[in-house]
Amino acid sequence: MKIILATRKSPLALVQAEMVAAHLRGAIPGAECELLKIVTTGDQQAGWSLSKQGGKGLFTAELEQALLRGEADVAVHSCKDLPGEMVAGLVVAGYLPREDVRDVLVLREGVTTPATIATSSPRRQMQLKRLFPSATFTEIRGNVDTRLKKIAAGTADATILARAGLNRLGIHSWAGVIFSPLNLDESVPAVG
């Protein structure tokens, strides 16, 4: 049995899709999994402000359309990217085992209190404003490694990333930045 998994092309998306493929192969004897790698509108429009252009659906719509057209059997998303309501005809069929749910404050080396924090997430901005009331916020886009490079280079003093994504990519340190996991009372993670 061949199962086609629709996924984004980012390194984290591919790691997560391979994890799903491994679970499917373990659960379904003889299953072969193939990844259908899709570039989404959110990937293509790196200059857009996500909150002003459609938010989460920018990273999921093309994968969902591939399902509806019968080009894929499964779409693999980070749960934080799912819209509040599922597209008619689609269901959430499963989840990967739970990872560390905490967010990680990524500080440029030498910075203790960030003056500028780069995050495109309104949820994270609101929570970080409580911790750093004098900080200003800027948008940041790109894959995890791109974001880490931007902070190390001084684009902003800090950003915030999901510990789960860092763990799945095997990133536990990075030159020029310090990882500071946030307690759940400091930063409530995304649903899922």
What does each model-identified segment do?
Residues 1-192:
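Domain-level signature for soluble enzymes in the chorismate/prephenate branch of the shikimate pathway
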